[in-house]
Every structure is written in C-alpha cells, then in structure tokens.
C-alpha cells in the first residue's frame, strides 16, 4: 500500500514526543508499505539535510514545506476570524495546501495519514481514504492550561479550548480511521462514535 504521511513538523531530531511518535510510525508503516512523506517546517534552523538522511531509509519520497513567520501571523489572524483553533491556523498555509494537494495527485496514494488535528485542514476534504492520529486531546491540554493561567490570559485559553473541542468533533467524520495514544484520551473526544478510535 502507498501511504501519504503529513506531519506538522519535520520528525528530526527526536527531541519532542510528537516527533518521536511520528518517526516510529513512519518506521512501522515502511515495513509493509511505501511511505510518501510530507512535513511542514516553520523552523528556519531545522537541519533539513540531516533530517532527510535520517528519514530516507523509510520513505520513497520526502518533501519539506517551509512556512514563513509572516505567513504564520497572517494565518493566525485568519483562523481567529474564521473561528478555527489558533493551533490549526499556525500550521495552515494556502500555498502549502496547494503543494500538498498536488503531491497527493502526483503520487496517487491508497491512504492519507495526518499526524494531529493541526494538519487535518489539509486532508479532510481529499477523496482518498484517510487516517487522522489525534495523538492526544489538544482541547484537554488547553483546558488544563486555562485553569493555571493568569486571569488576563484565561479568556484566550478558554476560547482556544472551546474551538479545539468543536474542531476535534467536526473533523471526526471526515476521516475513515482515527487513532489516539490512550483510551483515557479517547474518552475525552466529544463525539458519539468515539469508541471507533483505535
């Protein structure tokens, strides 16, 4: 099977949990499948050459799409005005979306795989069968942060919590397969069919 994997960050070096999870998922998927990797990159200091070397043994094709800080600021504003979670706005870019769509058309994968809801906007309307790895429940993390935030930041964290919770629900039916780290996390997804999450 040919699988198109979309990540919000280049999964190298392995200094963060989401990068480590993505790297291990790619290794596992590559055992019996052809992996087409596409990773967004907002880090100017990222060593793309080193990352490419580390990932090449497991991927048939690797594409890194750079997102500038200016573009991030513009898209954060757009997300805020549209009612989307700020975290989704941070990683969304219209030019990147076009590139991703063209990559999908070119490679004709059998399955799309997106890591975290941060990349869901790029994949949710594609016709190909698709999987979303919720990883964990971002809305609950935001709720916890709102509880310890200074009073002047609470409205912002609470707004993001509500938006994330709604978005986690809204994208559920756009994906054929859903995965998550634990049953405990799964139970926090606000959807009547959450038991379908693997």
Task: Go through each PLM region and give its residues.
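A conserved catalytic-core segment of Leloir-type glycosyltransferases
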Residues: 40-99, 106
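N-terminal subdomain of nucleotide-sugar transferases
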Residues: 1-63
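Helix N-cap/beta->alpha junction signal
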Residues: 116, 134-136, 182-183
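Short N-terminal targeting/anchoring amphipathic segment
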Residues: 100-119, 128-131
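Acceptor-binding helix/loop patch of EC 2.4 sugar-transfer enzymes
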Residues: 69-89, 131-169
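Structural motif
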Residues: 2, 110-111, 177
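A short, active-site helix/loop in glycosyltransferases that binds the activated sugar's phosphate group
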Residues: 46-51, 121-122, 161-195
